[in-house]
Amino acid sequence: MARGQQKIQSQQKNAKKQAGQKKKQGHDQKAAAKAALIYTCTVCRTQMPDPKTFKQHFESKHPKTPLPPELADVQA
């Protein structure tokens, strides 16, 4: 292999560049999406982002179960 050393240097340079790009990017989409899911259904443990969606879910999936008190005044 005539370019063995050059290949290794190129790989190291690329790894350093990729690490810099990842650090510059800051956050990932999965963590942000997971943080947005703050409401959890007490019956099925499904997570929802806002109370309106939570109330719609509860009324459609669990119609026989009484509505939780935090959803009583939410407009769906």
Curated annotation (Swiss-Prot):
Keywords: Cytoplasm, Metal-binding, Nucleus, Repressor, Translation regulation, Zinc, Zinc-finger. The keyword Nucleus applies. Residues 1-13 have a biased composition (Low complexity). One of its GO terms (molecular function) is zinc ion binding. Residues 14-25 have a biased composition (Basic residues). Its main location: cytoplasm. One of its GO terms (biological process) is negative regulation of stem cell population maintenance. Residues 53-62 have a biased composition (Basic and acidic residues). It is found in: Cytoplasm; Nucleus. InterPro entries: MBS1/2-like, SERF-like_N, ZNF706/At2g23090_sf, Znf_C2H2_type. Residues 1-32, 53-76 are annotated as: Disordered. One of its GO terms (cellular component) is nucleus. A zinc finger (C2H2-type) spans 39-62. It comes from the Eukaryota. Transcription repressor involved in the exit of embryonic stem cells (ESCs) from self-renewal. Acts by repressing expression of KLF4. This is Zinc finger protein 706. It comes from Mus musculus (Mouse).
